Regions:
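Short alpha-helical segments enriched in small residues
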Residues: 2-177
Length: 177
């Protein structure tokens, strides 16, 4: 895929790029125009979501930071995910993604929180097959999406980043209406 146009140029791209670069550039632009900020909470993506945002020039004006809570207990300790939610459903649940997004937003002092949790593979985890993913975006009440992604571990992680960025961009557009 070749990305061109103002968002791609702002991202420093002049050739083939992954869709996340274009999406991240749009998000940084919209957040900047509105004077809003973003924080991320990641599990299976392990920092890829934050990396996609910080790859964009100007991200420092809108990106507060992120928490990589790969271990289940860190989701509770660092992000405030309720222990009873984790005990009842485990870490791979849309409610956990929602709590992670709200926790990142609140604990890092951002307007928006964006979160990823799921199974990258290659093996199942907690009874869920690889590609079972939950994402959430929150500026108030969280919006969640549950995904069933296919492919190898790296592809699932990259596709999760793309889908999370799409969710946030959709929410930003809805928020503007």
């Amino acid at each position: 895929m070749t990305c061109s146009g103002p968002a791609a140029r702002a991202a420093g791209h002049d050739g083939p790029v992954h869709p996340s670069g274009e999406l991240a550039a749009q998000i940084v632009s919209v957040l900047g125009e509105r004077g809003q900020t973003l924080a991320t909470a990641e599990s299976l993506t392990g920092g890829l979501l934050g990396a996609a945002i910080t790859a964009i020039p100007g991200a420092s004006a809108v990106y507060r930071g992120g928490v990589i809570a790969y271990a289940t207990e860190l989701k509770a300790r660092l992000l405030g995910v309720p222990g009873d939610l984790l005990a009842r459903h485990g870490p791979i649940h849309p409610g956990v993604a929602a709590a992670m997004a709200m926790g990142a937003r609140d604990r890092l002092g951002a307007t928006w929180g964006l979160a990823t949790t799921g199974v990258a593979g290659p093996d199942p985890a907690d009874g869920f097959p690889p590609g079972t993913v939950h994402i959430a975006a929150s500026a108030g009440s969280p919006a969640t999406r549950s995904l069933a992604l296919a492919g190898a571990r790296d592809r699932i992680r990259r596709d999760t980043v793309d889908q999370a960025l799409r969710l946030l961009l959709d929410r930003l557009r809805e928020d503007a209406s």
